[in-house]
Amino acid sequence: MGGRRAPEGSPAAGNDRLKAARVRIEDVAAQAGVSMKTVSRVLNHEPNVSERTRQRVEAVVEMLRYRPHPSARVLAGRRAYLIAMLFDNPSSNYLMEIEMGVLDACQAHHYNLMLAPLAYDDHDLVRKVESLVVQSQLDGVVLTAPITDDAALLARLAALGVPHSSVSAKEENRHAGVAVDEVGAVCAMMAHLTSLGHTRIAHITGHAAHGASGWRLTGYREGLRRAGLRFDASLVVEGEFSHESGHRAAKALLKLKQRPTAIFAANDDMAAGAICAICESGLSVPQDISVCGFDDTPIAHQIHPALTTVRQPTREMGRLAATELLKEIREPGSGGFVNVPYTLQLRRSTGPVGV
């Protein structure tokens, strides 16, 4: 009563036998008429494979429904096919976007991703990262701010030969990775505010340990200079890149004898916190005080009024950082540093003075 078996020696018969057992890389190589090394290169998106060969191998992989076993890949290539994203950042919106971008790159290149939360100010940070790399057999790590700028960690990773790339590292720490011209972006935002007639503009900084905090403060001061405005230290309040710190900083600014007419917060979470504080004080945004941020994370669209902000393509930045890391893993020295463009997103949280 069973179905008809394919004639012995026919391609269909061969496929029947392959389905009866797990398809191996040897089966793909034999069917495609290439070596196992060539199949491995195609699966790992490595160079030095002709487009015609690549297409033939990919067609056989699809036909046989071959899926490489993780342990076999490790043994064949002496890699774990695993990278980690190291982070210590209170902005969950920002981290989620970066993480999704890193995942995009990992999935495209058949790698797995480990998320590793760390404390930047932990005196044992370097040892913990070294232990993570060794115990998990990581192929490399993506560093996010402020971990990107830990000199001792960078030196140890280099000494161990651990490939790494960074998201928004300081100029002197840039190897493989990605960044935006943050100083130029903030200058553009300041030009937007001054064009609306604002002359008393406050700034809520990020955490002092983050390179981005320094760049954005520099952009704020340069923007004032270009507009012919004097820097006033009383209008600068330190935050920590969190909603709570933005709320707290805005409360302090509202207590000034002469309050600001506009607030530039160093990220969207703090800008959202500032808007909450202003509304709680019985004032309106932007009628009484304009507010703007940086990043264009989802919260910028979720609050009311919608937030004017600098858009840096955070998901794309995560993808690019991981892509450059994977290049570095495959061929040391091949990973590069990529600068991505920013754009101003002008929304309803900013307006002319007194309007």
Give a label for each model feature.
Residues 1-20, 78-191, 195:
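Alpha-helical recognition/docking segments in bacterial nutrient-uptake
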Residues 108-109, 160, 225-231, 255-259, ...:
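Short helix-capping segments at alpha-helix termini
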Residues 2, 251-355:
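Flexible loop/turn connectors
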Residues 1-80, 354:
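N-terminal helix-turn-helix DNA-binding module of bacterial transcription factors
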Residues 84-86, 137-145, 202-204, 257-267, ...:
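Periplasmic-binding protein-like
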Residues 31, 36-41, 75-91, 140, ...:
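Short beta-strand segments enriched in small/hydrophobic residues
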Residues 70, 88-97, 115-124, 147, ...:
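Hinge/beta->alpha junction and helix N-cap segments in small-molecule ligand-binding domains
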